[in-house]
């Protein structure tokens, strides 16, 4: 019995170490892509960032495409968890305040988001693998954002509205590279007004 328990503990420890290594590798992949861009990053760059050997990476992810596809899924889940933590205990705040929180979170991680979008656009094999691996997972996580915006409850297009929010914030961040910050704030205010008006009109017709 002692040997059996010892064996189980060893298997769990090996599994825990393997999962920990994979998380470090995926985190390092995202950091490297965010800093250097997908095309410029090599597996060796990622290995050095993660503090592991190149072989430790290829043991789990045979190619850069396999690794990046897994890293994108990891990023989507991590982003959702980050936003979820930011909204913790803030259920009763106004819509505009919640939109400000979402903007702040998306803005903080946009460099990675942007580089991942560029990677998916540039590498058709990566895009195909990512779509196969993701399946309904992305839609599932996107649907979770509804919890932060109860105003969307019952809407047939709630997922679309969330996607519109995310698309606007991505676009606003790109604009912020060359635009005056005051102009970006004006854009955000107009968007919030438009969204509030749309939601109010939807409630009236419901």
Pin down the residues of each PLM region.
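Hydrophobic alpha-helical connector segments
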Residues: 66, 70, 77, 81-110, ...
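Residues in the helix-turn-helix
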Residues: 42, 56
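Basic, helix-initiating cap at the start of DNA-binding domains
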Residues: 1-36, 43-49, 66
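Residues at secondary-structure transition points
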Residues: 9-16, 20, 62, 66, ...
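Residues in soluble alpha-helical coiled-coils and helical-bundle/repeat scaffolds
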Residues: 62-66, 70, 104-107, 121, ...
């Amino acid at each position: 019995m002692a040997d059996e328990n010892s064996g189980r503990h060893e298997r769990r420890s090996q599994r825990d170490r393997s999962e920990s290594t994979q998380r470090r590798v995926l985190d390092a992949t995202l950091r490297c892509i965010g800093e250097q861009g997908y095309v410029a990053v090599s597996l060796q760059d990622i290995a050095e960032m993660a503090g592991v050997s190149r072989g430790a990476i290829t043991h789990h992810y045979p190619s850069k495409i396999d690794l990046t596809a897994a890293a994108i899924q990891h990023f989507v889940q991590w982003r959702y968890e980050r936003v979820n933590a930011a909204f913790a205990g803030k259920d009763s705040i106004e819509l505009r305040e919640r939109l400000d929180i979402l903007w702040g979170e998306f803005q903080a991680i946009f460099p990675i988001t942007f580089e991942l979008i560029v990677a998916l656009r540039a590498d058709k094999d990566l895009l195909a693998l990512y779509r196969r691996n993701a399946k309904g997972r992305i839609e599932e996580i996107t649907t979770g954002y509804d919890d932060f915006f109860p105003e969307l409850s019952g809407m047939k297009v709630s997922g679309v509205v969330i996607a519109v929010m995310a698309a606007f914030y991505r676009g606003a961040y790109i604009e912020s590279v060359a635009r005056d910050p005051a102009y970006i704030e004006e854009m955000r205010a107009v968007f919030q007004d438009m969204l509030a008006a749309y939601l109010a009109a939807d409630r009236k017709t419901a």
